């Protein structure tokens, strides 16, 4: 039976990730934030209105790379700290302050793209040929030139970046801090409920009455928040539509795909393949689940059931390490060493606690190790999540080590398409 979710302060330290691998303490974070502001002010003073040669352009971008590195560390530290506990008011307030400081710096630096876009293509190409580290940044300037707004407008948009991200923050706050799930009851027995308890435990429970009751109780609570969720989503969609129009795209699809370097025909093909080719197999899969588990009918609450219950043993975290290490050993010694480091250096946040983000993700701040979030339930699905996220870690370990920070912001299509989970 699933256990009541703990508060973050009550979980075991060994189940949490070690953010001191980014900054040893908050003082170190604040020192880097101050350095960020100092470097930003100096760069603006030295280069605003003076990007008139290939050498000057590359000098400016060399210093911008250092600034981007600090932004990545400060931003990741704060985001990771808040992602595990939306009830931690100190970390939430700290993240708000740091995000405001980052927005102010990015607003001050918006002159770079505006001024570069006003230069001739010949000058930008000359600068790109002179610096491997800055080449892709400069090529992106040329690609985005037709969609850039006035310098004043771009500066304002950068300053408002924290505000324009509000819809997702509102959604997460409602989901992780405000929603209080009641216990549900089956045959006179009460069961605790929460986001991760449902998504990572009850959805896989082979007791049909418990699984479906959990689904009903979970869905009922989501229904209570449908209006605020819809309002937040609508705000995000309206913002994307407005920006698409302002930047001269034909529609929102083209605007969003442009940012991901994805051609519209490729996107349409993927959607068509899923609907036309995958759908029949998924219907067969649902019928198979019904036969294996002897269900009267297959509902949405039943789709996460294991096809082979005997293939889903309960596991410890240490046992997961053995599965993952053996499974990924084919990728070589460096990969196995990375897996070992991930476990021993606490790259993972395994804890189940109230206020923690759901699902799983891997963050790989430039120049540091990766950080992987999940809620451990001791199922084989958790092992697959670990292997999946370590795949991202391995990708960005190699990517970050070999390339300029300008070249590590890769398209979602590149890093998700190889994964069957995405």
Segments the model singles out, each with a brief description of its role:
Residues 10-15, 301-304, 366-370, 396-402:
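Short acidic (Asp/Glu) and glycine-rich catalytic loops that position anionic groups and cofactors
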Residues 396-414:
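Post-HEXXH active-site segment of zinc metalloproteases
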Residues 385, 389, 393:
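Catalytic glutamate of the conserved HExxH
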Residues 415-422:
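Conserved small/polar residues in nucleotide/adenosyl-binding loops
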Residues 1-310, 321:
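A well-structured
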Residues 240-243, 251, 258, 349-363, ...:
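Peripheral/terminal regions associated with large enzymatic or DNA-binding modules
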Residues 373-386:
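Short pre-active-site segment immediately N-terminal to the catalytic Zn-binding motif
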Residues 311-366, 379-380:
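Auxiliary, metal-adjacent structural segments of Zn-dependent hydrolase domains
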């Amino acid at each position: 039976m699933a256990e009541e979710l703990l508060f973050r302060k009550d979980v075991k330290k060994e189940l949490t990730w070690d953010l001191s691998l980014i900054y040893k303490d908050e003082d170190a974070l604040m020192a880097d934030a101050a350095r960020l502001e100092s470097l930003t002010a100096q760069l603006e003073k030295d280069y605003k209105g003076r990007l008139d040669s290939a050498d000057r352009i590359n000098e400016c971008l060399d210093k911008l790379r250092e600034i981007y590195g600090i932004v990545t560390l400060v931003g990741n530290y704060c985001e990771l700290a808040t992602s595990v506990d939306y009830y931690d008011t100190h970390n939430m307030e700290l993240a708000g302050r740091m995000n405001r400081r980052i927005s102010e710096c990015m607003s001050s630096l918006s002159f770079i793209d505006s001024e570069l876009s006003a230069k001739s293509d010949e000058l930008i190409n000359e600068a790109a040929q002179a610096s491997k580290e800055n080449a892709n940044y400069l090529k992106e300037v040329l690609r985005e030139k037709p969609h850039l707004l006035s310098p004043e407008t771009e500066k304002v948009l950068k300053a408002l970046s924290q505000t324009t991200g509000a819809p997702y923050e509102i959604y997460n706050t409602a989901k992780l801090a405000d929603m209080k799930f009641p216990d549900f009851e089956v045959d006179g027995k009460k069961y605790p409920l929460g986001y991760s308890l449902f998504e990572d435990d009850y959805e896989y429970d082979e007791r049909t009455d418990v699984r479906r009751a959990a689904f009903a109780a979970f869905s009922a609570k989501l229904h209570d928040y449908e209006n605020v969720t819809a309002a937040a989503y609508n705000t995000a969609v309206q913002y994307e539509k407005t920006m698409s129009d302002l930047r001269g795209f034909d529609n929102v699809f083209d605007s969003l795909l442009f940012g991901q370097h994805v051609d519209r025909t490729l996107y349409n093909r993927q959607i068509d393949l899923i609907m036309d080719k995958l759908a029949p197999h998924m219907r067969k899969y649902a019928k198979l689940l019904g036969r294996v588990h002897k269900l009267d009918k297959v509902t949405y609450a039943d789709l996460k059931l294991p096809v082979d219950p005997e293939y889903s043993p309960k596991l410890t975290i240490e046992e997961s390490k053995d599965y993952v290490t053996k499974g990924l050993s084919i990728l070589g010694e460096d990969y196995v060493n990375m897996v070992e480091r991930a476990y021993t250096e606490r790259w993972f946040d395994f804890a189940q606690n109230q206020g923690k983000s759901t699902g799983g993700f891997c963050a790989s701040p430039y120049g540091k190790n990766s950080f992987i979030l999940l809620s451990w339930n001791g199922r084989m699905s958790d092992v697959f999540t670990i292997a999946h996220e370590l795949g991202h870690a391995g990708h960005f370990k190699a990517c970050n080590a070999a390339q300029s920070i300008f070249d590590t912001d890769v398209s979602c299509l590149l890093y998700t398409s190889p994964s069957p989970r995405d």
